[in-house]
C-alpha cells in the first residue's frame, strides 16, 4: 500500500492506494467519529462491493443508500434520496457518509455530507479510474443543472480517500478509457516525463496491468494533491486541472448528461484545447498531434460531435464557472507540460478552433 497526503493544514487527509483495501477497516476507523455510517452507492457498484464494505465496517451501524446509476441522475431529485435515507434512519451530526462508486456518487455523497445538518464527515472510496485519479481528491462536490454541469455544489474535503485498485477489474473498457483521459491530462498540464511514461505504458494500462495502474494512479493523485494543497478553492493554479473541460462540459450539456461519458467529452475537449494552443503559437503541430495520438491510443474519441456548431459551443461555454466579468477564461497549454488559464486570445482564434475540421486533422495523423 502507498499513502499520499493532501496538505491542507488541520483539514489534511490521506490517500490510501493499494490492492484489497476494501477489506481493511483499520484504514477507515481513524476517520469515523461516531457509530453511524451511511454508505452511498449506485445500482451498478452496490452488487459488487456494498456487502464487502459493509462487512468491513461491521463494528458500526451501517445504512446503505443505493441510487440510480449515471450522470443523468446527478440532480436534486437523486440528492434528496440521500437526505431521505439519513433522516429516516435518524442519523445525527456524528454520522460519516462513505461514497462508494464513481465520480457521480462521490460528488453527490460529498455534497449531501456538506449539507446534512450543516456538515457531516465523509470518506471517498472511488471505484472507477476517473474518480480515483481526479474527482475523489480535492473536495469538489455537487450536482448538475439543466443549464450547466456541476453548477450547484460546494468545496468540502473528505476525511480520507481509499483507493482499492482491484475494483478496476470490474470496470468496463469504456469507463477505463474515460478515466485515462484525466490521467493524460496530468502529463499535459504539469508532468512532461509522465506524458512519456504514458506513451510507453498505455497498452499495459488498458490491459489492467496492476503495477502500471498503481503507478498511474499514484502519479495522478500526487499531482492533484500538490495542486489542491496550493490552491484549494480554484482561485488560480487549480483551474489548470480543467484542461479540456470547458469544451468538454459543453459537449456533455448539449448531448445530454451521460450520452458522452465525462472522460470522453474531456478527451474531445482536450483535442480542441491542443488545437487552440497551436493556433496561438504556443505548441507546434507535432506536439498537438502527439497529444491527439495518446488520447487515441487510450481508446478515446478525439473528434467533437459533428452536430455541434460553434454557436452551440459558445452558448454552453457562456455558463462555465471560469467566466469572470463576462469574459471566458480557457485552460490552454503554454507548452507541453505547462498549462495556463487565460482570456488572452482573439475571438477569431476561438472561432477558428470551434470551426476546425477535426476529422481531417485526425485523418492526417
Swiss-Prot record:
Swiss-Prot/TrEMBL keywords: Amino-acid biosynthesis, Aromatic amino acid biosynthesis, Cobalt, Cytoplasm, Lyase, Metal-binding, NAD, Nucleotide-binding, Zinc
Name the chain's protein.
3-dehydroquinate synthase
Q: Per the database entry, which stretches of residues form a coiled coil? A: none
One Gene Ontology term, aspect cellular component:
cytoplasm
Asked if the keyword RNA-binding belongs to this entry, the reply reads no
Q: Enumerate the NCBIfam families for this protein.
A: aroB
Q: Which gene encodes it?
A: aroB
Record-listed E.C. numbers: 4.2.3.4
GO BP terms: namely: amino acid biosynthetic process; aromatic amino acid family biosynthetic process; chorismate biosynthetic process
Q: What is its main location?
A: cytoplasm
What is the reaction catalyzed?
A: 7-phospho-2-dehydro-3-deoxy-D-arabino-heptonate = 3-dehydroquinate + phosphate
Q: Where in the cell is it found?
A: Cytoplasm
Matching entries from InterPro entries are given as: Dehydroquinate_synthase, DHQ_synth_AroB, DHQ_synth_fam, DHQS/DOIS_N, DHQS_C
Residues binding NAD(+): 69-74, 103-107, 127-128, 140, 149
Q: Name one GO molecular function term.
A: metal ion binding
Reading the lineage from the top rank, the first entry is: Bacteria
Q: What does this protein do?
A: Catalyzes the conversion of 3-deoxy-D-arabino-heptulosonate 7-phosphate (DAHP) to dehydroquinate (DHQ).
